[in-house]
Each structure stands twice: as C-alpha cells, then as structure tokens.
Design a protein with these regions (language model features):
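Selective recognition of hydrophobic, aromatic-rich stretches within alpha-helical transmembrane segments
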Residues: 3, 47-80, 105-145, 155, ...
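Alpha-helical hydrophobic membrane-insertion segments
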Residues: 32-35, 39-43, 67, 167, ...
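Juxtamembrane "helix exit" motif at the C-terminal ends of alpha-helical transmembrane segments
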Residues: 37-49, 170-183
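Short, intrinsically disordered, charge-rich cytosolic tails of integral membrane proteins
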Residues: 226-240
Length: 240
C-alpha cells in the first residue's frame, strides 16, 4: 500500500524498473549527452589550459542539454516512447533555461556556503524548477515557484535521494580532475582502475537510475498537486 512514508522507496523502485525497461534507449542518450557536454568543455579547457574558458560552453550549450535530458527522463517516466530529440529541446526555451540554470546554481551555492544544510534544503525545494521550465514551459520565476509548491510537505521524501546522489558524486570521482588554484585550474586525468570503474558505474548506472527516480517523483508530485487543486475547485460553496 502506498503511504507518504514509503514514497521514497516507491520512487527509487519505479526509477530502477524504468531504467532497466528502457536501458537500450537510455544508455545511447547518456553517451550522446556526455559527448556533447563533457568532451567539448574538456577540449576547450585543455586548449586554453584554464578551466574558466570552458564556462561559457557549459552555460550556453551544456545547460540547455541538461534540461533537455530532464525532459527525456520525464517522457520515459510517463511511459512515452523515448525520443533523442528531447535532449535538444532545452534550446527552444533558451533564455528561460539559462535563467533557471544560473539562479538554481546560485541558490544552491549560496546555501552550501551557509553551512551546507540550507543548500540541501534549497536544492530539494527548487530542484524541480529545472523540470518545470521545460515540461510546463514556465518562466524563470514561475519555475521556482512551481517547484516550491509541489515539493511542499515532501522534502523529507526527496532528502534520501538527494543525499544518495551526493554520496555517489563524492565516492565516485570523475576521471577528469583539476589541479592548481581557483584562478588557474589546470586539467588533469585520473586513470587509476578503481576511478575508471567507479566513473563508469556512476555515469551509466547509478546517475541514470536516480534521474529516472527523480522523474518519477516529479510526475507524482505534479499529479498530487493537480488532484489537490481539482478537489478544491470542485468543493461546493457553502457560504450564505
């Protein structure tokens, strides 16, 4: 029986099942996504020998592709046929997507600077802004308002998924690393066997699974809010 207490398990379980059922569609999309986002940014970084030169590409190209991947997972979670073109649909709302990406990054970064806890809370509260902007075609402000609205009362259910994602990112570092100071971060590669193994597992299994789980959670919370609003609208007016 579905209860508020086991929603986290339901989302993770449904996400895993959807990942396995659609793995033939998901893995090529994940590969294409990383080729389009990570590879060019890395080449720019290597060419200029400075991480900061890759920031414009990551913001104006990789960010819309990331939002498009959210739509890709949302459509799979809804039982629709996976379309690789979804990955590029973030460019159809370019300004809103860039705005949401920048504001969300600033909110989370600011929260983590305030002793981490606010960053986690704000990350959960506003995380679905990156879904609403492409799924519901909302503006920047409305995307954050909508995310806060549908996550109200469910932050504790999303907390475990968020912490699981953070743990995976910490325990499975990337092959591409940075050396040097903040002003001049240099490109370095870590090709130790355990690093490569953990990177492959993270990139092609764990993170796509959590992406599917978050898409399932988003759909469920949207449905809950729509049901709640429909019930309120259908209540009889008892005022005299």
């Amino acid at each position: 029986m579905e209860t508020e207490e086991n929603l986290t398990y339901i989302w993770l379980n449904e996400g895993w099942d959807s990942y396995l059922d659609n793995i033939r569609h998901i893995l090529p999309a994940v590969v294409a996504f990383h080729i389009l986002t990570t590879l060019p940014a890395t080449l720019i970084w290597k060419y200029f020998d400075n991480r900061w030169y890759a920031i414009p590409y990551e913001l104006f190209i990789a960010a819309p592709l990331t939002i498009g991947m959210n739509l890709f997972f949302i459509n799979i979670a809804r039982g629709r046929i996976a379309e690789y073109g979804d990955i590029f649909k973030g460019f159809s709302m370019f300004l809103n997507v860039i705005g949401v990406s920048i504001v969300f990054g600033l909110i989370v970064a600011g929260g983590f600077l305030m002793f981490i806890v606010p960053g986690v809370i704000w990350g959960i509260m506003y995380g679905f802004a990156q879904y609403a902007v492409i799924d519901r075609k909302t503006g920047v402000k409305d995307s954050f308002s909508y995310s806060a609205m549908i996550t109200y009362g469910y932050k504790h259910n999303l907390l475990f998924i968020f912490l699981l994602w953070m743990t995976i990112e910490i325990l499975a570092p990337g092959v591409i690393t940075s050396t040097g100071g903040l002003r001049h971060p240099n490109l370095a590669l870590d090709v130790k066997p355990w690093v490569i193994t953990s990177f492959v597992l993270k990139t092609f299994i764990f993170l796509p699974w959590l992406d599917m789980a978050m898409a399932k959670a988003y759909i469920r919370l949207v449905k809950n809010k729509e049901t709640e609003q429909s019930t309120e609208n259908n209540e009889p007016d008892l005022s005299l």
